[in-house]
Curated annotation (Swiss-Prot):
This is Cytochrome c biogenesis protein CcsA. It is a multi-pass membrane protein. HAMAP family: CytC_CcsA. It is found in: Plastid, Chloroplast thylakoid membrane. May interact with Ccs1. InterPro entries: Cyt_c_assembly (IPR002541), Cyt_c_biogenesis_CcsA (IPR017562), Cyt_c_biogenesis_CcsA/CcmC (IPR045062). It comes from Crucihimalaya wallichii (Rock-cress). The chain crosses the membrane at residues 13-33, 46-66, 73-93, 101-121, 146-166, 234-254, 263-283, 295-315. Belongs to the CcmF/CycK/Ccl1/NrfE/CcsA family. Its main location: plastid. It comes from the Eukaryota. The keyword Cell division does not apply.
């Protein structure tokens, strides 16, 4: 009873804090709060409080259930929300690169945790005895690595999607013109020609407009570079987690079912997801095709992760259907 009350308290604390952080962060898009010293640092600390709240929630559930809390959909979603908090903390303590990961990690954490605690999963929060197939020391290693991999890959893919949105918005309708580079050069030459033939007063105004336009484009360029920087590194980390998770799952499957690979629906989609992100990493090694192309591949991977994560759960089929919507 005490553990159940403590779990509810920690759930409400973590959910409330991340909700407040998300609300305030998006308010900063409408109101300029840059002058408030330490404001954004306080938002980051809010995510850290959420991290400790979810950590306490997982440990509490681990203690009174007697097993690692990754046996059903509710627990895996809470763990996934915890993974997003970790990603945010890693970027927070890395002061060398400015980033905007809280715009990705905070909404992801609140939506995932909100879905986990919603009425759709009202039967899931009750911890139950593990089925025989899950009573193994491989449960902690395999499932935790897979969900950490999902979290990192989802975060990196969302950054790639943001990169695509900013890039296409920057280019605009002229993106598909073949002579876009020529038009750009002509516009630049024309702008500087005008500077020589207008009076001094108008010249100053025009120079200010050009400076403002250049600063705006330079900021977008920096933002795109930051998104690409963090997307590549987070996806690389997630790919490592996913690879080790699949390998540990193969060893566990051999001990449980007598075969390393059974082409179960979950295994098949995990392999497809792994292949897509392997292609992404391969594209990043080629300077001629990386950039938008790699971001498009990561966007496809974003959809595949959700198919891999929820596909078996929604259908309730295969060897990985434990804790699904249809299973009891």
């Amino acid at each position: 009873m005490i553990f159940s009350i403590l779990e509810h308290i920690l759930t409400h604390i973590s959910f409330s804090v991340v909700s407040i952080v998300l609300t305030i962060y998006f308010l900063t898009l409408l109101v300029n709060l840059d002058e408030i010293i330490g404001f954004f640092d306080s938002l980051d600390k809010g995510i850290i409080i959420t991290f400790f709240g979810i950590t306490g929630l997982l440990f509490t559930r681990w203690i009174y259930s007697g097993h690692f809390p990754l046996s059903n959909l509710y627990e895996s979603l809470i763990f996934l929300s915890w993974a997003f908090s970790i990603i945010h903390m890693v970027s927070y303590f890395n002061k060398k690169q400015q980033n905007h990961l809280n715009a990705i990690t905070a909404p992801s954490a609140i939506f995932i945790q909100g879905f986990a605690t919603s009425g759709l999963l009202n039967k899931m929060p009750q911890s139950a005895i593990l089925v025989p197939a899950l009573q193994s020391q491989w449960l902690m290693m395999h499932v935790s690595l897979m969900i950490l991999g999902y979290g990192a890959l989802l975060c990196g893919s969302l950054l790639s999607i943001a990169l695509l949105v900013i890039t296409f918005r920057k280019v605009g309708p002229t993106f598909w013109k073949k002579n876009i580079k020529k038009n750009f050069l002509l516009n630049e030459l024309f702008s500087f020609d005008v500077l020589y033939y207008i009076n001094e007063r108008n010249s100053i105004l025009l120079q200010q407009n050009i400076t403002f336009s250049f600063s705006k484009n330079y900021y977008r360029y920096q933002l795109i570079q930051q998104l690409d920087y963090w997307s590549f590194r987070i996806i690389s980390l997630g790919f490592i987690f996913l690879t080790v998770g699949i390998l540990s799952g193969a060893v566990w499957a051999n001990e449980t079912w007598g075969s390393y690979w059974n082409w179960d629906p979950k295994e098949t989609w995990a392999f497809i997801t792994w292949t897509i992100f392997a292609i992404y990493l391969h594209i990043k090694t080629n300077r001629n095709v990386r950039g938008i192309n790699s971001a498009i591949v990561a966007s496809i991977g974003f959809l595949l992760i959700w198919i891999c994560y929820f596909g078996v759960i929604l259908l309730g089929i295969g060897l990985h259907s434990y804790g699904s919507f249809t299973s009891n």
